[in-house]
From Swiss-Prot:
Domain of life: Eukaryota
GO cellular component, one term: late endosome membrane
Organism this protein belongs to: Pongo abelii (Sumatran orangutan)
Cytoplasmic side: 260-323
Extracellular side: 36-238
Post-translational modification: N-glycosylated.
Pfam families given in the database record: BSMAP
Function according to Swiss-Prot or TrEMBL: Acts as a regulator of autophagy in response to S.aureus infection by promoting activation of LC3 (MAP1LC3A, MAP1LC3B or MAP1LC3C). Acts by interacting with ATG16L1, leading to promote a functional complex between LC3 and ATG16L1 and promoting LC3 lipidation and subsequent activation of autophagy. Modulates the O-glycosylation and complex N-glycosylation steps occurring during the Golgi maturation of several proteins such as APP, BACE1, SEAP or PRNP. Inhibits APP transport to the cell surface and further shedding.
Protein name, as recorded: Transmembrane protein 59
Gene transcribed to yield this protein: TMEM59
Entries under InterPro entries matching the protein: Uncharacterised_TMEM59 (IPR022065)
UniProt domain comment: The ATG16L1-binding motif mediates interaction with ATG16L1 and promotes autophagy.
Signal sequence segment: 1-35
Transmembrane segments: 239-259
Tagged with keyword Transmembrane: yes
Length: 323
């Protein structure tokens, strides 16, 4: 069996550690054991090895060099794919074939190694497609469902602040309507034993009396339904009314804030820069016309250089003077 001569080239081109290349070189004697050793890191090459065994059976090819060269081509393709991170499989195949050319000098072994690179290519493509299918994908309706869940949480939290109550309407004997309002309370009654016959009869009589009373109250309530229909509607729909009011209030506040910011006067006043040509710039901005030289009158007085100023007035003592 010819030993591979391109270990230095493979280590230089692929950037592999020497320990990995040494393991790959020592694994040439046992194809199945080497495949199991590299499966955890470089991927599965068992399918490619089986294809090589079908291409180079031992009963047809008594020499094992071509079979081992084909299997080594499978491993070289996996190593190149691991180094290149599987970005371009065609480039990986070219690197694998170059490594086979450098590793083997005989044409039969080179062809077998190239065949191993070619056999590993479809399995690498299938594995890459499987990995891509396992990647999580976002559905098109996911943003809508997220907004809907957020809106439902906001509505639930808003309704939790609203206290519900029970309202009872009763009509007194004088025709006035009495309204009773209380918070809902849930009471769990214990298991009651079977009542005696006399207690059952008394309870039935009480129930019949309550039914008659409720029917009378209901009749009177229907008669006065037109007057208190609005109050009853408010009591039944108080939750939705308060929720709508809260949402509208928030929207109005946001609109007021945006309108105030948009229509506010700018408070920043740019500082004016001082310039020695300030008067000239002011005249240019105001578009003022200069006076012509002919309109200017220059008045000069004749003064002599030897002329001196006159004496100062004498001082007067105000204490000795009469005013």
């Amino acid at each position: 069996m010819a030993a591979p001569k391109g270990s230095l080239w493979v280590r230089t081109q692929l950037g592999l550690p020497p320990l990995l290349l040494l393991t790959m070189a020592l694994a040439g004697g046992s194809g199945t054991a080497s495949a199991e050793a590299f499966d955890s890191v470089l991927g599965d090459t068992a399918s490619c090895h089986r294809a090589c065994q079908l291409t180079y059976p031992l009963h047809t090819y008594p020499k094992e060099e071509e079979l081992y060269a084909c299997q080594r081509g499978c491993r070289l393709f996996s190593i190149c794919q691991f180094v290149d991170d599987g970005i371009d499989l065609n480039r990986t195949k070219l690197e694998c074939e170059s490594a086979c050319t450098e590793a083997y000098s005989q044409s039969d072994e080179q062809y077998a190694c190239h065949l191993g690179c070619q056999n590993q290519l479809p399995f690498a493509e299938l594995r890459q497609e499987q990995l891509m299918s396992l990647m999580p994908k976002m559905h098109l309706l996911f943003p809508l469902t997220l907004v809907r869940s957020f809106w439902s949480d906001v509505m639930d939290s808003a309704q939790s602040f609203i206290t519900s109550s029970w309202t009872f309407y009763l009509q007194a004997d004088d025709g006035k309507i009495v309204i009773f309002q209380s918070k809902p309370e849930i009471q769990y009654a214990p298991h009651l034993e079977q009542e005696p016959t006399n207690l059952r009869e008394s309870s039935l009589s009480k129930m019949s009396y309550l039914q008659m009373r409720n029917s009378q109250v209901h009749r009177n309530f229907l008669e006065d339904g037109e007057s208190d229909g609005f109050l009853r509607c408010l009591s039944l729909n108080s939750g939705w009314i308060l929720t709508t009011t809260l949402v509208l209030s928030v929207m109005v506040l946001l609109w007021i804030c945006c309108a105030t910011v948009a229509t506010a006067v700018e408070q920043y006043v740019p500082s004016e820069k001082l310039s020695i040509y300030g008067d000239l710039e002011f005249m240019n901005e105001q578009k003022l016309n200069r006076y012509p030289a002919s309109s200017l009158v220059v008045v000069r007085s004749k003064t002599e250089d030897h002329e001196e100023a006159g004496p100062l007035p004498t001082k007067v003592n105000l204490a000795h003077s009469e005013i």
